Amino acid sequence: MKTVYEIQQFLKQFGTIIYVGDRIADLELMEAELTELYHAQLIDVKDFQTARLLLRHEIQFLKEKRKS
């Protein structure tokens, strides 16, 4: 997974569609859902780590952008 869109499509395979209207909240909910899937052993560690890193990077980018 290389984009947030790919993570959304990945989560959709598990029946999860996240949209609350706030981009940062959406990303944080995606991260929480990925964590739940990982703890339930439904996704492997590589997919989990890659997706989580990408989401955290995007969240940090958006938070810094809001401050400016």
Q: What do the predicted segments below correspond to?
A:
Residues 29-61:
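Short, charge-rich amphipathic interface segments used for partner binding and complex assembly
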